[in-house]
Regions:
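Conserved, structured core segments of small domains
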Residues: 1-118
Length: 118
């Protein structure tokens, strides 16, 4: 079985940990990567798309309606945010009083990203 693990936390809390503890936690991430886990994190900026009336509307914040459960996910490759908005505007959740939250993905397995964080 594979699991999608949605991790919640803040950069502020991460940075408040002692460096030794951060290193230990990053070592655990490396163990997961060696086991073949696909690991990623979302950037803090978010775009929510709604097309309730057939026309895409966007907001630069998460979908506030907590009564709507997570129904699914997709990883979409696109040239830019406008292309993604156009692609998801016609999906069931965007049209049926739900929303699609769009966040750029940072691939943690990418060596360039790991070098950037050092």
């Amino acid at each position: 079985m594979k699991f999608l693990c949605l991790a919640y936390g803040t950069e502020k809390d991460w940075r408040s940990l002692p460096r030794a503890e951060q290193d230990a936690l990053l070592a655990q991430d490396e163990i997961l990567r060696q086991r073949g886990a696909l690991m990623g994190a979302v950037e803090p900026n978010v775009t929510t798309v709604q097309a309730w009336n057939g026309k895409p509307e966007t907001a630069k914040e998460p979908f506030p309606q907590l009564s709507a459960p997570l129904a699914g996910f997709a990883i979409i490759e696109a040239e830019n945010l406008d292309e993604v908005v156009a692609l998801v505007a016609e999906t069931p959740c965007a049209r049926a009083k739900g929303a699609i939250e769009v966040r750029p993905i940072m691939i943690l397995n990418d060596k360039e990203w790991r070098n950037f964080k050092k």
